[in-house]
Curated annotation (Swiss-Prot):
Residues 23-45 are annotated as: Disordered. Residues 74-220 form the Cupin type-1 domain. It comes from Physarum polycephalum. This is Spherulin-1A. InterPro entries: Cupin_1 (IPR006045), Germin (IPR001929), Germin_Mn-BS (IPR019780), RmlC-like_jellyroll (IPR014710), RmlC_Cupin_sf (IPR011051). GO terms for cellular component: extracellular region. GO terms for molecular function: manganese ion binding. It comes from the Eukaryota. Residues 1-19 form the signal peptide.
Length: 246
């Protein structure tokens, strides 16, 4: 497991150094353009049959024979695979279905292209620990692991990295006036992701109401309808400081 995670870290730094080379650094002159949806963009994917064959291959040699050469490359900059778009930027994530070469290696990766004042909303990865490397810009990031644990928060600049333990609620905020990028590596090819607020409001409304000490079911339902898309636009103070709002 240690060697697998060290490999993930090596890939993370290699990908980040390459991707950061020509990532735009000029401050935007207008606010980020809102996106119509945060659902993954349409993409082709490995067939369920291929995924099953790779998972059940008797050896690594057999697994490699099942893949074409181009299936060992994933283009985070231009890919339409694994993309989630919001008002505050986009994240691009590999998975078994969109990057089948990871199957059997216990690694996965997500790259976040976060706009000025954007936030990768609080979320968890139920099946993986994350190491997050800042490729460009600067982020405020933090996590909360469990009841009675303390909140851990950091300001991370380009070239720095942090760890989010498996299952911890965590976030990344770009509080600056220009785009920023992070590269997240995982020690599981299927790390999973659960956005905290949307998952919470997906529970029965009366359960959510009791949890928030709100007696009105209608109020709970109204709150759930106005959750931001991920990545979202962050605090209004940042928008005002950057000249994006009055």
């Amino acid at each position: 497991m240690k060697s697998t995670f060290l490999f993930a870290l090596f890939v993370l730094f290699l990908a980040a150094s390459e991707a950061a080379t020509d990532y735009p650094t000029n401050p935007p002159t207008t606010p980020p353009t809102p996106a119509p949806t945060s659902t993954p963009l349409p993409s082709s994917a490995a067939s369920p049959e291929l995924v099953a064959q790779l998972l059940n291959a008797p050896s690594e040699l057999d697994r490699i024979k099942l893949l074409k050469d181009n299936q060992f490359v994933f283009d985070f900059k231009n890919s339409k695979l694994g993309v989630t778009q919001g008002t505050g930027g986009k994240t691009v994530a590999t998975s078994r279905t969109n990057f089948p070469a990871v199957i059997g290696h216990n690694v996965a990766m997500t790259v976040g292209f976060i706009e000025a004042c954007g936030i990768n909303l609080p979320h968890t990865h139920p099946r993986a620990t994350e190491i997050n490397f800042i490729a460009s810009g600067k982020f405020e990031a933090g996590f909360f692991l469990e009841n009675q644990a303390k909140f851990i928060g950091h300001t991370l600049e380009a070239g720095m990295a942090t760890v989010f333990p498996q299952g911890a609620i965590h976030f990344e905020i770009n509080m600056n006036c220009e785009p920023a990028m992070f590269v997240a590596a995982f020690n599981n090819e299927d790390p999973g992701v659960q956005t905290t607020a949307s998952s919470f409001f997906g529970l029965p409304a009366d359960v959510v109401g009791v949890s928030l000490n709100i007696s009105s079911i209608q109020t709970v339902e109204d709150l759930g309808k106005h959750l931001p898309q991920n990545p979202a636009v962050a605090m209004q103070a940042c928008m005002k400081r950057c000249g994006f709002s009055d």
